[in-house]
Amino acid sequence: MSMRIGNETFKQAVKTELKDDFMRGAVSSAQDRLRERKLKTQEDLGNWEEWRDHSEEIRQHTLANLDYYLNMLSENVAAKGGHVFFAETAEEANQYVQKVLRDKNAKKVAKSKSMVTEEIGLNEAMEAVGCEVIETDLGEYILQVDDHNPPSHIVVPALHLNKEQIEKVFKEKLGYDKSSQPEELALFARQKLREEFLSADVGVTGCNFGVAESGSFSLVTNEGNARMVTTLPKTQITVMGMERLVPTHEELEVLVSMLTRSAVGQKLTSYVTTLTGPRAEDEIDGPEEFHLIIVDNGRSKILGTQFQSILQCIRCAACVNVCPVYRQTGGHSYGSIYPGPIGAVLSPLLGGYDTYKELPYASTLCGACTEACPVKIPLHDLLLEHRRVIVEEEHMSPVAERLVMKGFAQGASHSTLFKYGTKAAPALMSPFENKDKGMITKGPKPLQAWTNSRDFPMPDDENFRDWMQNRLKRGAK
């Protein structure tokens, strides 16, 4: 899988997703549940806004000194016996991993959940050199067994499937013969995955945060699979987006606390693991060889721009969990492994406007995402800035839209045109009026996008100017 999901545009995908009542119900239920849990743990923490301010300061400071902390991280990883590779592109990262796999004659890779590896299409690259890749996060494992069904949520990848659908997948693909009870499904998956952990040659993980002062990296999970991936295979590969680091363990403590509360509404996840390099001589477990791949893949081009604050993201999906557009369309409609508001901002920056120019418009600009963000990214402002760039700099807005807006600007800028335009509007729109409703129920382009889902009011026969003049003639003040 790579960053792009499917071949449909956002508008095309939305038409399909809006008809999927189960998906919309599942997303709504999950959003409500996750949001309520987040609010509860926020209250338990107390002074939530102060924690947000502090988290924002940590992320802004780190980004402002990113070269310094990346250098510190790489030096400390190397000092602990690890190997560090800076990958400018997805291709460079994948080629490095392929080389490690070939050198180790690896046949099986156990992998924990990672958005950056999805972004660069690492699974396909590993399979291309003859490796069997096993996703060990339960949600990702379900999707992999289900013919590589793409994830629909950053934190809960199989959000769009219910337990009956998962039972069917396990029965058809793995010979499962028990019920659809979540406990039995999870136990079955656990037994299957235990075999994979024990036979894997290489373990691959993402990274929630790298810690510059010690050369460590942290993994936050509820299932414990990341610990298995990082302790059983002899070779360990960690892939990290270049912005995903903190200066010290003190900052790590703050951001992990914010991450777990914002992502799943927990004070702390079941497992918070911090690992540092390969195993030492006096240690009995852990990898014999450790590789850290630091991925740029377009991130350095965001630094120093008006979009830099998006790199503060800690991948908690709090913005996704409050987004009204995601609530109705689900994750697959975005065509990116990054859905919701974070995806609508980040995807055009990493994947380009040619592919993702629709996503900044997949927003009501209500600002709920900005209010939910634990590191105070101004998401709705960034979406507006994307729209400005698309129209003013990239000139990529639809031709019909440009013509309509140009015509409106002309009319609104000249009083005579505006006067006669408003007088003529009722007559011009009359052929499209539904006489029974007194509304336009099926309008011409570009009104069709509106009238396909709601009615459009008919212009009043008496415009405001005429109404005001008549009122003044009657002596009204």
UniProtKB/Swiss-Prot annotation:
Keyword annotations from UniProtKB, A to Z: 4Fe-4S, Electron transport, Iron, Iron-sulfur, Metal-binding, Repeat, Transport
UniProt cross-references to SUPFAM superfamilies, sorted A to Z: alpha-helical ferredoxin, NagB/RpiA/CoA transferase-like
GO terms for MF: 4 iron, 4 sulfur cluster binding; metal ion binding
Binding residues annotated for [4Fe-4S] cluster 2, in chain numbering: 323, 366, 369
Every 4Fe-4S ferredoxin-type domain range: 304-334, 353-382
Binding residues annotated for [4Fe-4S] cluster 1, in chain numbering: 313, 316, 319, 373
Disulfide links within the chain: none
InterPro entries: 4Fe4S_Fe-S-bd, 4Fe4S_Fe_S_CS, FTHF_cligase-like_sf, Helical_ferredxn, LUD_dom, LutB, LutB/LldF, LutB_C
Biological processes, Gene Ontology terms: lactate metabolic process
Pfam families noted in UniProt: Fer4_8, LUD_dom, LutB_C
Superkingdom of the source species: Bacteria
Segment forming the signal sequence: none
Keyword Nucleus (UniProt): no
Region (Disordered): 443-463
Family: Belongs to the LutB/YkgF family.
Matches recorded under HAMAP family: LutB
PANTHER family (UniProt xref): LACTATE UTILIZATION PROTEIN B (PTHR47153:SF2)
Role, per record: Is involved in L-lactate degradation and allows cells to grow with lactate as the sole carbon source. Has probably a role as an electron transporter during oxidation of L-lactate.
Protein name, per record: Lactate utilization protein B
